[in-house]
């Protein structure tokens, strides 16, 4: 009797285990089917609820040209150098002016009184010619040449000082720019001009120029030169205002 109960218990246990295995197998097949269907049909939308739209502003929106107050973009004071340049060029002008005055007053045409003395000049051994240093042509020509050389040196020094920039100021609102040039009298007494920002353009990037940054102002001949040894106080603001390229 006990043996029959034992066999009956073993049989019921085997039946229960087989039923559980069959149920688990069917459940796994159903789950695999559902997973396959979900993978095929919903792959595109499965992560869509996790995506949040994010706006990324441009880098230039963080730097605006409409400043709330005057901003000093560039500064480079070379008053001492331009004082020495003014002294040197002024001395050159006085020297050539004196030499021209000496030639005009000392060289005289002596043909009226005696036979004019001629000087024979040879150039490189190829050809030679006679010069009458007392003739009016030589006297006027030598005097004019001295004045032209002295005046040219002084004019070049003045032009260089008028095109060398000491300060660049962006005014409140960002609509106008003031450009101050170098002067031997100091930065407070230097020549300056105030123009709209739309009339200022830079034809070379400040990092590409080796010695000077060329700045073009509409209505003015030649470039305004910004020395690379100067200080750019706000590089980003400089690049989008004065340092930007604009067709003029």
Swiss-Prot record:
Keywords assigned by UniProt, alphabetized: Membrane, Mitochondrion, Mitochondrion inner membrane, Transmembrane, Transmembrane helix
Taxonomic lineage: Eukaryota, Metazoa, Chordata, Craniata, Vertebrata
Protein origin, superkingdom: Eukaryota
InterPro entries (UniProt xref): Tmem223, TMEM70/TMEM186/TMEM223
Keyword set includes Metal-binding: no
Family that this chain belongs to: Belongs to the TMEM223 family.
Pfam families in UniProt: TMEM70
GO biological process, one term: mitochondrial cytochrome c oxidase assembly
GO molecular function ontology, one term from the record: mitochondrial ribosome binding
Record localization: Mitochondrion inner membrane
Protein's name according to its UniProt entry: Transmembrane protein 223
Chief place where the protein resides: mitochondrion
GO cellular component, one term: mitochondrion
Transmembrane parts of this sequence: 46-68, 84-104, 140-160
Species this chain originates from: Danio rerio (Zebrafish)
Membrane topology classification: Multi-pass membrane protein
